[in-house]
Every structure is written in C-alpha cells, then in structure tokens.
UniProtKB/Swiss-Prot annotation:
This is UDP-N-acetylmuramate--L-alanine ligase. Keywords: ATP-binding, Cell cycle, Cell division, Cell shape, Cell wall biogenesis/degradation, Cytoplasm, Ligase, Nucleotide-binding, Peptidoglycan synthesis. It comes from Staphylococcus saprophyticus subsp. saprophyticus (strain ATCC 15305 / DSM 20229 / NCIMB 8711 / NCTC 7292 / S-41). One of its GO terms (molecular function) is UDP-N-acetylmuramate-L-alanine ligase activity. The gene is murC. InterPro entries: Mur-like_cat_sf, Mur_ligase_C, Mur_ligase_C_dom_sf, Mur_ligase_cen, Mur_ligase_N, MurCDEF_pg_biosynth, UDP-N-AcMur_Ala_ligase_MurC. It is found in: Cytoplasm. Pathway: Cell wall biogenesis; peptidoglycan biosynthesis. GO terms for biological process: cell division; cell wall organization; peptidoglycan biosynthetic process; regulation of cell shape.
Amino acid sequence: MTHYHFVGIKGAGMSSLAQIMHDLGNEVQGSDIKNYVFTEVALKNNGIKILPFDANNIQSDMVVVQGNAFPDTHEEVVKAHELKLEVIRYHDFLGHIINQYTSVAVTGAHGKTSTTGLLSHVMNGDKKTSFLIGDGTGLGIPASDYFAFEACEYRRHFLSYHPDYAIMTNIDFDHPDYFKDVDDVFNAFQEMAHNVKKAIIAWGDDTHLRKIEADVPVYYYGFSNKDDVYADNLEISEKGTKFDVYFKGEYFDTFLSPQFGDHNILNALSVITISYLESLNIDNIKEALETFGGVKRRFNETKVGNQVLVDDYAHHPREISATIETARKKYPNKDVIAVFQPHTFSRTQAFLGEFAECLSLADKTFLCEIFGSIRENSGNLTIQDLVQRIDGATLIDEESVNALEQYSDAVILFMGAGDIQKIQRAYMEKIGVTSPF
C-alpha cells in the first residue's frame, strides 16, 4: 500500500484521481484551500482527509501528486523535494496509470466531462471500467478491463497520455491565456493523435478534426450519411431521444437516450462507436444508455413548483448555446432564464462578443461578477463590459436573487465554472428549498 498526498486535492481531476487510488487500496490524503468546492463532497464521503496547505503535511513515506495549478515553489512541494520524495505531476501520474488497461481518452474543447461520464456508465454495463471524470468523480475497480478518462488539452497536458482509443469531440479556441489561436489548439490535437494506439473517434462536422492525420483509423460520427457512424430518424418524447445508428451506411441498431439536445446524441454516438469497435454486448450497452443519469454540474435539475433550476458548468460560448438548446428542447413551453458567471478575465476578454451573442438566446440574462482563477485573479475589463452588450441584462448577486422569483414558469440556468452555485444556493434558501449542494 502506497501513501499518497495530493497537492490541490479539490481540483476536479485531482479529486477523481485521489478517489481512484483510494479505491485501489492505497492510503490517500490531500490539501487545498478552505473555501467550499463541490468536489469535496465525494472526497469526504470516501473518508479521504482534506487538510489546509502546510509543509508539515508532507511525511517521509509519501508519494506526492502535484496539481497542475501549483508551482514547484509551493511550500508542500518544496518540502517533498527536501525529503527526496517522489513528486509527480497529475498528468504524468495519470499517464502511467492508464497503461495498465485498455484505455479510452475523451478530449475536445467542449463535451469532455459529459462524454466521459456517459462512456464510463455505458461501458460498465458490460465490462469492468475504472474511470476519471472531470466533474470530480473517479472510481477504481480492481481487475478492470477498461479505463475511461477525461484528457484536457490545456498546456498540452494530454500529450502525457498514450491511450488505446481517443474520442475527440471538437476543436475550438479556448484557454486564451495559453493557446495563441485555434491553429495552435489544432496543432496540439494533431500531436495527441499520434499518441493513440488503436483508433480515433471524431465529430465529423468539425472542419479541424477532418484534417487530423493519424497512424490509426479515424472514425467520424455525426448526423450525415457521409460520416462513418451516424444517427438518423430522431424521435423526441418525454422519455428522451430515440435514434437509429448506421455504421458505414448499414443499419446497426436503434437506441434510446434519456437526454435531449444534439450534442448529447453526438456524445452517445461516440460511445456507441467505442462499444462497437470493442465488440461489447449491444443489449447491455443499450440498457446502460437508457439509465444514464448525467454527470455533476451538467444540466443538473432541481424542480421547484413550475420552475426548473439547472446547475451547469457551461463557461464557453459554445457550451452556453448547447445548454440553452437543451432547455428549449426539453421544456419548449417554458421561458429560459440565464444566470451566468464569467470564468477568468482572459476568457471573458477573448470571447466578449461571443458571450453576448449566445446569452442573448435566453429570454432574460442575469450576470455575476467575473470569477478569477488561481493563476489570474484580476483584469482590465469588468462585468459591465458584458452587461452593455446584452439587451436587458441585469447584475445579480446573493443579495438580489429574489429577482428570479418573478419567472414562475421558467427554466433558470445557473451557468459557470467558478462559484456560481452560491447564487443558486442563495436563491433556494430565499424560497425555502433545501439546496442540493
């Protein structure tokens, strides 16, 4: 048994990885900020100790896993090196772990977490599959056949991975504090493609992904019969979305997803493709798909009277558009109200116009102050720069949440990657409802 200490254990990936190592019989603890982060619930439920940062946390028998947001000058990392302990970065550690399994990486600018959650759930319907999801959920199953994991492109960390398969959901410009432009992002994905050992499954409508060159087969999925795998004859009902799947132009089977929105059907197609390539039992796969309940902070619903309160991680314009589309399709007779907290000043600056455009798809938009990150906590613009670009946009905070009560028959989307949950929590407390977080 190894004793692991995670520096920054509340990070989404770090939390997931800590849970996996705990499940596999290791002693696990970690440190982080005192502020509440939604990932800590799963850690505490697993009995994993969370400590405040302190050099004295580091003991001579530990392996130290260093979160990517923390520099080598961090007091705990310095202490670990002084004790001559093994110190390994998150992405390097994960890269070693996946080599023990048939591994499936899920990468892309958007949709990684939702797709990884679906993939792990569906594959576990037929084969033992350990998984690491970017919503802070991880599970290590002894003697697993497969390992499904989220692979982030930020700072090219995913180049540490050499998976058997890679699902590439899309390529888009994001993380403007690191990537220069979309061509820089494409180059990172092109490098990643050469790391894949068996096959790549990629969205066929993405013009950048269509240019990917690889040493393994690339299977494109989508809604066109020009794709290798495509969905047709979509039917939406209260049960979800039913659709036929075709492989290389030939009918394969009919599936039912409990989810709504084109992006969720695309995610399902990528997972079905993996299942097909690995010859998994299709009846088990269909049954598992029908029981998927979603992942944390991805269109998580709480119904209060005729209001539907949705907690969602959307923090990029394309993700916001997809979340609003899902709300429109699932609740076509309700107004859609957006409550959005921009995440990082650099992203807000880079996509100011796009944020205004996508948020204008809602019937009404409320905006919170910009949430900085550990790396960047201030900038030259303010939330007013976005407010001025959206007709009728209004500022909101924990003290003014009563403004949401007037939308008595609406879907209210609380969106953001920071601490937007505090706004939803304040609103639920205001109307006398217990918050789920």
